């Protein structure tokens, strides 16, 4: 293109300039210029601004659930402020919940420690009672073994003497009373020293006063004493 042709290309008429300005300022409609491009700006009707979409599927990728929820109801320009406010609220709720859970766990731990101490004390008492019962059972078993032993249990000498003295008195009076009923002899008449000595020897030999040998020896001695007196 030569210089002359360039000057001729940019040498525009006034009508051409208006048409060009109108094309630059007015949106095109199917490739056509508006009906009245020379209309004044103040006479033109205000055009509605396109509504801003608050949620775009391509922008929601990689967002958290809270961010997606906020984008659903809040304008995109206010999302950052909303996220900050909601984040602070959630942090406060989380701290309050954590403090409540900590207090609850401490209370439960205290109750468990008290229950454990009570259980330990109860176990100690049960162990003490069990030891006492075991000792009693061992003592009873030892006594049963001693009483059922095939070997006779030795007697205390003092107990033997006391039993013999008591047995002799009872046996001697019983023998004399029996003989008195048969022969009509009183204990005073038949109770000489010789008869008493013989009864003592018989009691010492038999070690108890209720044996047939004891009564027989006492009665025989009384008979002999009566014969001597006749």
UniProtKB/Swiss-Prot annotation:
Its main location: host cell. The keyword Phosphoprotein applies. One of its GO terms (cellular component) is host cell cytoplasm. Residues 20-62 are annotated as: Disordered. It holds the Pfam family Rhabdo_M1. It is found in: Host cytoplasm. Phosphorylated. Belongs to the novirhabdovirus protein P family. Essential component of the RNA polymerase transcription and replication complex. Binds the viral ribonucleocapsid and positions the L polymerase on the template. This is Phosphoprotein.
């Amino acid at each position: 293109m030569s210089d002359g042709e360039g000057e001729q290309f940019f040498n525009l008429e006034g009508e051409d300039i208006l048409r060009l300005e109108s094309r630059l300022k007015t949106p095109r409609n199917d490739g056509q210029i508006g009906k009245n491009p020379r209309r004044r700006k103040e006479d033109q009707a205000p055009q509605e601004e396109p509504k801003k979409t608050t949620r775009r599927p391509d922008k929601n990728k990689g967002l958290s659930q809270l961010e997606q929820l906020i984008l659903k109801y809040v304008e995109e320009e206010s999302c950052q402020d909303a996220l900050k406010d909601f984040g602070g609220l959630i942090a406060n709720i989380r701290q309050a919940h954590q403090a409540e859970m900590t207090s609850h766990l401490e209370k439960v731990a205290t109750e468990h420690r008290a229950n454990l101490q009570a259980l330990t004390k109860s176990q100690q008492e049960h162990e003490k009672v069990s030891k006492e019962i075991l000792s009693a059972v061992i003592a009873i078993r030892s006594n049963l073994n001693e009483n059922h032993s095939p070997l006779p249990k030795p007697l205390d000498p003092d107990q033997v003497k006391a039993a013999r003295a008591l047995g002799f008195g009872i046996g001697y009076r019983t023998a004399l009373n029996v003989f008195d009923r048969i022969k009509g002899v009183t204990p005073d008449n038949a109770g000489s020293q010789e008869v008493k000595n013989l009864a003592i020897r018989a009691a010492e030999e038999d070690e108890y006063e209720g044996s047939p040998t004891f009564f027989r020896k006492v009665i025989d001695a009384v008979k002999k004493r009566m014969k001597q007196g006749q």
